[in-house]
């Protein structure tokens, strides 16, 4: 009840939870945090990922092409969407900061870095006995972030190919 950002969930005393479909914005927080698996989102991962890519395209269409720079701080990587109201132990060590003029390339590079990282003890990954690198979000949450990135590429928002250039800190 407290996790819903639009107050669409209420509990009638002694009865079941009630979700007001008119208020619900389909964010999925309730389904993700329900420890009993009692709540399911009516929207599947493919439709959600396509919607994310299409929404991104709509927003980016309001900017002059070539005038957007993307910066990903791959730090304190949380197991859930950053829209969730709580923080948890990061899934992996901080991976750094990525900068690109291609949204698909930077997201692909970010996911590739995370796929190579070993999950941290005491994280949600460890809670699920995930101790090896690879497909971390898919294994932790059952959601594949690469779906949205793939759809973004299909929509022409960028290319998944990239060159990662590491900039080392200058010694004094």
What residue ranges belong to the model's regions?
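Extended, low-polarity segments enriched in aliphatic/aromatic residues
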Residues: 2-172
